[in-house]
Every structure is written in C-alpha cells, then in structure tokens.
Amino acid sequence: MTLLAPRWLTLSALLALGATTSIGCAPPTDEEAGEEGSSTDDITQIDHTKVKRQSIGNCWIYASASWVEALNKRSTGVEANVSESYWTYWHWFEQLANGRSMTEISTGGSYGTIAGLIDRYGLMLEADFVAAESEAEMSNRQSAALAAINESLKTGALKDPAVRRNRAKVRAELDKAWGLDRTVVGRLDAVFGTGVTKTLDRSYVRNRPNNSIIRARDFDAAIYDFTTNTVKKVKLQDALGTGSYWSRSGPLAFQEVNYPSSAAARRKFQIAVQKSLHASVPVIISWKVDFNALSQSSQFSKEELDRRGPGRQGGHMTVMDDYQVKLSDGRVLKAGEPATADLLTRALDTRATVEFFRVKNSWGAIRPDRWSDAAKPGYHDLLMSYLNGPIKECVERDGHSDPTNCPGSVTPWWDAVLPAGLGNDIGF
C-alpha cells in the first residue's frame, strides 16, 4: 500500500464533540479465561490516563495527549496531565503569526501537526500552564479563549494585518485571551522570547529550557520494540522521530498510515493494530463520525445508521484501547476479558474477524445526552461494519453537514498511527 499524506482535520470537517454548544472536531450541540493453571493476559493492557472532555474542535490534540500520557505512564508509573491548552495556544499562534487566520481560528489538525508543535514548543503539564484546570475534566478556558481570539480577529486588535505580522503583539493577544498569569507569561518569554525568536528545535538543541517547559527528548516514554520483542524505556522524541509534517523518520518513530481498500489489506492492517494493542502500545485512529450511528450503548453501528439515516458528520481522532474478535472456530474473545497467550495468537489469524475496536474518547466519561449504557465510561466501541462502511457522505453548508444532501460515500476509517516495526506488510 502506498503511504499517503496525513489527513487534515479541518474546522469545517471536524465535529466539536466535547461540549454541547460548540463546533470543531464534529460539532457538539450539547470469553472466558483459559484452562485452570494456564497464564492469562488481557487482550490489551494499555494503562490509559483519565478521560477528558474537549470543549472545542481540537480532538486531535486530546488524542495525541492521551497517547503521550500512556507512553509516559508505562515508563514512570505516574499519571501525567499533559496540557492540551498549551498545544492549542501554539497552534493558534502559528496560524495568526504566519498569516493563515484572517477572520476565524481553525481548531483542526492532525498527528503531523502535533508532532511539529512538540518539536518546536515541547509540552507543559496543565498545572504549569492553566493551574485552575489541572483537575478539570473539561477546559472552559479553551472555549473562552477561542471566542476572544475570534472576536479580536473580527473587531479587535487582530483585525489589523499589521498587528498579526507582529509576533510579540500576537502573543500578547493570546496571553490575554487565555487569561495567562504573569508567571506563565514569564516562563514563555524566558524560553521563546516575547516575539518567539527561539524554538526548542533550533535554540535548545543542547540545553534544557526549564521554566516548566519540557522538550520531547527529556520526557520519559516506554514503547515496545518489535524487532527485539522487548519493552524499551525511551524518550518521547524517539516515538515522534524527526522530520516534517508529511513524514517522520527514526528507528522507533510512529507513522501515520492510511486504511487500505481491499479486504485482504485491511485484515493485515487490523492485525498490525492488534499486535500493537497486545504489546500495550496505544494507537491513534482517525475516523469519520456520523452521530446517527451512535447507539445508547456507546457503539458506532452501521445498522443503527442505516435505520436512522445520515446525521451530523465530521472527522475525529481518538486512541485505541481494546478490541473484540471472533476466532476462526467461532469462539469470541470479548473486550476487557482475559485470554491465554495461545488465544491471543489465534486472534491474529487472517481468518479471525475483529468485531469492534474500543477507543478512549475525549467527550467526557458520563454523557447521558449522548449515551446511557457504556461498557466503559468515556470509551466507545467502533464496530467494524461501521469502520469499513461505506457510509453516505453529506455535503457541508456553513461548516455543518447537510443530512438531506449526501451524494457520495466514504469509508469511515481513515488512518492509524502505528509503531515502528509493524507496517512492513501494509506500506511502511
């Protein structure tokens, strides 16, 4: 399979899934254990951090943060709360300072976008960026800041192109919109300069920036080396690799790979994902949401969608956690239940059929307005009949999909970010 360019999750294509009144990453309106004495293992053992809830359309940042936190937790045993707001701040800065935002900020992005942001600006913990939200499930600061910046673009300081060309003034507007206190602003100034004359990839190659700003090369992570079949404690930079938005390189670098079209290639792709999950390595997945496919049991079902017809649509990014599979003899290995090593091996047979993948989402843990009976709070089951599609694709009007105008069709599963060593049979 040819490796295609990563899919860009645009503002108009994304659904703001975290809140009930915003638009963004798809808009929010509001079997058994083995024989006695045999060793068992969960189908997956990814030690995820707590579920969060996005308030704007930056699901790709939340998915990436979950991925980073899981890699770090496996290495340290500690649950870090990485600041999604910090990366959102710099995403907006680059749009404004580079002339890409004239009337409204785009909240959309991709894995390639976040990798580049981490290269240049590293990461911060939420307690060090927006301390008031260090324990919050949802960031109200993000939605307030978005409204403030968009208003500034329309009627305020950022309406003036000369201001947008002044990087120090752009940062000042962002600092004000985000309500950053003087200590945090001082940290950013000390590391990057008031006009962002320094970035981590250029000015801090040898020295740590300190001031609570962490380079990827200093942030602990643990991955699974599929060439040696061992867990390795590394740094986040090893998992990210180096390179541009379009391509990341490095012996341990994860790669964004498009979901193939043929049944045989798709099964190889699924097996690569299964192997990653067996090794407790989180996998980011990009997929198309149609809310009419969401059942009260928190499943995305083609059957449900066919019954109800098309609804609101958009792009989404989440992190995989588990899966359910029917073996070639008809036995079902259920998500969340233990299985012997032999059964896990049989789950990788090309004749085995994955029934669904379970993903950690960024829509909050308890959402009676969206679902009432989740197998795992904050997680969703993406049935393969839905992911394989095809489903109707509706035309967008004013940033919203029109369920009455759906002339085309699409495969909902777009791509996945896979660890090094798993893609030889599927394209990289």
Predicted regions and their residues:
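Conserved catalytic-core surface of thiol
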Residues: A335-F428
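Bacterial N-terminal signal peptides that target proteins for export
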Residues: M1-S12
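Processing junctions and N-termini across compartments
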Residues: G18-A19, R53
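Active-site nucleophile-adjacent alpha helix/oxyanion-hole segment immediately C-terminal to the catalytic cysteine
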Residues: G37-D238, G243, I271-A279, V283, ...
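N-terminal Sec signal peptide cleavage junction
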Residues: I23-C25
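Active-site-adjacent substructure of cysteine-protease-like catalytic cores
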Residues: L158-P161, N258-R358
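Mixed-charge, low-complexity intrinsically disordered regions
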Residues: V231-P260, E304-R308
